[in-house]
C-alpha cells in the first residue's frame, strides 16, 4: 500500500485547510518544491498535489509551480483541483503528471470524464469528496444530493481507473479515517481506491492496510506529516514494498532541507 504525502497549494504556498474551509488556512511552508523533494527523500512512493486555488475558481493558478515540482521529482505525481476541461487535463499530462484526479466535472460533465478515460487509459481517477456520504463539489463549497457510492459505480462504468475517497469532515482533523465508509465504497466498486482524510497515526495506516485485500491501494496523508504526528519513513516501512513486520521506534528527529 502506498503512503502518499499531500501538498495542498494555495497562493503558491504549501498549506492545509481544516475540513476544506478556506477561512481556516495553516501555512506549513513557503516553498512547496522544497517540501516535495523532502518527502521524496524520505521514501514517498508518489506525491499528491492539490491546486486549491483552481478547486475554488476553476482556473489553474499554480500550473507553472506544479510543472516545476513534477520536473524536479523522480517519483510519480498525481494532481487534483479544478480540472474541469479537456485542456486542463491535457496540459497537466504534457507537464509529466502521472494521474489526473477529477472531481466536480464527474458530476457536471460525466461524458467528458468518459472521453478522457478512453483517451488516457489508467490515468484518469475520480475524487469522491464526501460530506455525510454525499459528494461535494467546487472546492467542497457545495454539496450534491448524489451518494459517493452511486457516483463511484457510474464512473467505474465509464472507465475511470480508480478513486480517491476523502471524508471531508475528517480532513485536517487527525480524527482517523472513516473505515465504515471506505468499506461501503470498496464493496460497490472493483476499481482501486486511495483513502484520504483524518489519517493521524501509524495505527491508522495499519487499519487502512487491512483493507488492501478489498481494493484499497493507498492512503494520502497531510496534516499528520506536517505536524510530525506521523513519521513518513516508518509508515512506508510498515505497509510499503518490502515492509517490516516490526516497526522500531523513531529515536531521531527530522527537519526540512
Curated annotation (Swiss-Prot):
GO terms for biological process: L-histidine biosynthetic process; L-tryptophan biosynthetic process. It is found in: Cytoplasm. GO terms for molecular function: 1-(5-phosphoribosyl)-5-[(5-phosphoribosylamino)methylideneamino]imidazole-4-carboxamide isomerase activity. SUPFAM superfamilies: Ribulose-phoshate binding barrel. Pfam families: His_biosynth (PF00977). Pathway: Amino-acid biosynthesis; L-histidine biosynthesis; L-histidine from 5-phospho-alpha-D-ribose 1-diphosphate: step 4/9. Keywords: Amino-acid biosynthesis, Cytoplasm, Histidine biosynthesis, Isomerase. Gene3D superfamilies: Aldolase class I. InterPro entries: Aldolase_TIM, His_biosynth, HisA_bact_arch, Isoase_HisA-like, Isoase_HisA-like_bact, RibuloseP-bd_barrel. Its main location: cytoplasm. The active site is at 8 (proton acceptor), 129 (proton donor). GO terms for cellular component: cytoplasm. It comes from the Bacteria. It catalyses: 1-(5-phospho-beta-D-ribosyl)-5-[(5-phospho-beta-D-ribosylamino)methylideneamino]imidazole-4-carboxamide = 5-[(5-phospho-1-deoxy-D-ribulos-1-ylimino)methylamino]-1-(5-phospho-beta-D-ribosyl)imidazole-4-carboxamide. Its EC number is 5.3.1.16. The keyword Chloroplast does not apply. Belongs to the HisA/HisF family. HAMAP family: HisA. This is 1-(5-phosphoribosyl)-5-[(5-phosphoribosylamino)methylideneamino] imidazole-4-carboxamide isomerase. The gene is hisA.
Amino acid at each position: 500500500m502506498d503512503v502518499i504525502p499531500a501538498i495542498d497549494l494555495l497562493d503558491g504556498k504549501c498549506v492545509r485547510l481544516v475540513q476544506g474551509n478556506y477561512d481556516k488556512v495553516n501555512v506549513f511552508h513557503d516553498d512547496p518544491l522544497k517540501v516535495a523533494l523532502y518527502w521524496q527523500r524520505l521514501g514517498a512512493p508518489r506525491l499528491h498535489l492539490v491546486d486549491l486555488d483552481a478547486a475554488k475558481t476553476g482556473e489553474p493558478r499554480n500550473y507553472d509551480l506544479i510543472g516545476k515540482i513534477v520536473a524536479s521529482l523522480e517519483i510519480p505525481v498525481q494532481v487534483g483541483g479544478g480540472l474541469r476541461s479537456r485542456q486542463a487535463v491535457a496540459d497537466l499530462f504534457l507537464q509529466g503528471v502521472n494521474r489526473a484526479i477529477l472531481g466536480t466535472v464527474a458530476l457536471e460533465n460525466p461524458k467528458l470524464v468518459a472521453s478522457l478515460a478512453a483517451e488516457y487509459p489508467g490515468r484518469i481517477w475520480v475524487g469522491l469528496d464526501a460530506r455525510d456520504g454525499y459528494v461535494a463539489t467546487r472546492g467542497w463549497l457545495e454539496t450534491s444530493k448524489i451518494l459517493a457510492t452511486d457516483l463511484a459505480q457510474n464512473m467505474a462504468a465509464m472507465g475511470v481507473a480508480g478513486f480517491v475517497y476523502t471524508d471531508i469532515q475528517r480532513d485536517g482533523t487527525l480524527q482517523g479515517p472513516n473505515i465504515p465508509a471506505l468499506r461501503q465504497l470498496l464493496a460497490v466498486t472493483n476499481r482501486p481506491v486511495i483513502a484520504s482524510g483524518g489519517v493521524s497515526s501509524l495505527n491508522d495506516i495499519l487499519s487502512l492496510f487491512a483493507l488492501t485485500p478489498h481494493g484499497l491501494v493507498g492512503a494520502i496523508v497531510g496534516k499528520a506529516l506536517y505536524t510530525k504526528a506521523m513519521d513518513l519513513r516508518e509508515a512506508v516501512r510498515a505497509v510499503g514494498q518490502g515492509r517490516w513486520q516490526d516497526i522500531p521506534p523513531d529515536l531521531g528527529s527530522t527537519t526540512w532541507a
